[in-house]
Amino acid sequence: PDVDFRIDHAAGRVVWTIDGEDYTKHYYPPNLQDCEFGADSLVSEMDYAGVDMALLHTNPMLGRSSTYQAECVRRFPDRFRSMAPVDEWRIHDDTDAVIRELEESITKHGLHAIKFNANGYKISDDPWDDGIYRPFWETATSLNVPIFISLSMGPGIKSWEASQSAQDGYLNELKILMRWMERYSDTTTSITHGFPYRAFIDGDSINLPDAVFEPFQNPNLSMEVCFPVRIGDTFDFPYREVFPTIQSMVEHIGADRLLWGTDMPFQNRHCTYRQSRDHIEKYCDFLGQDDLDLIMGGTASRILGLSKD
């Protein structure tokens, strides 16, 4: 049906109409004008929150321009590094072009990592570790930059579902990741956004099965520590309900393979940039200073090859 789907730029939200009544949804925080959050806005937030450097993610909803990403880094070379975007859905039918674009992102524009959304299931149910993806991966892994992978729940399952099928789907995606890492075991790899915590919420706690930690037998795999954007509408600051999960991640993965992230500006729907630091640095009293130093910057610096200075 025609629901007149549209963007309310001034209010920074999407709007649609059903039976004469307008509905809206905020995915960006509601204070963004024209749905924009550029490099200057991020630097301002970083200055206020005491964040010295950021790794810029890419995603279809954020635009797909390596040229723009590179320009942000050029303007603020001491503040930004950037992932390169990949049009994953085009790999099936336009493999050579996607490979060419990726090579250009790294070799011409000088971007620092690769972002891959493992959600090609919108095109085909083929697993993303091999088959039609093999030529792409052969090139991607040869570029000698870290690869950041956003895992899905598998074909036909939404990431926000809290169901056994969602849990099973995610565990199967981890098996695909492990197969991929067997082939590219020397590639520095990181899982973005942490685990799909919503699928494993049980009352006021998160119950992660031991199987989610199996991929980390590969010492080259790390994971983002990113809670507010994923569960900030379920638990309140300082998110004490997730503290046992953070502790378990440190025990099973290691602080030297955990890196703090936020999904700015999306996470500002739930807390401030400073609070996304504070809930770990001020309230996770089970973390020693060495662990905090690694999670809050040391691990990311190592992955990106930054100097300790």
Predicted regions and their residues:
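Mid-domain alpha/beta scaffold segments of enzyme catalytic cores
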Residues: 1-135, 139, 143
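Short, electropositive alpha-helical surface patch
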Residues: 69-74, 78, 207-214, 245-251, ...
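Catalytic pocket-lining loop regions of alpha/beta-barrel enzymes
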Residues: 112-113, 125-259
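Mid-to-C-terminal alpha-helical segments outside catalytic/metal-binding sites
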Residues: 2-53, 247-248, 252-259, 267-309
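Conserved strand-to-helix beginnings and helix N-cap segments that scaffold or border functional pockets
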Residues: 66-67, 95-99, 130, 202-205, ...
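Active-site-proximal loop/turn and secondary-structure-junction residues that shape catalytic pockets
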Residues: 60, 86-88, 118-120, 153-155, ...
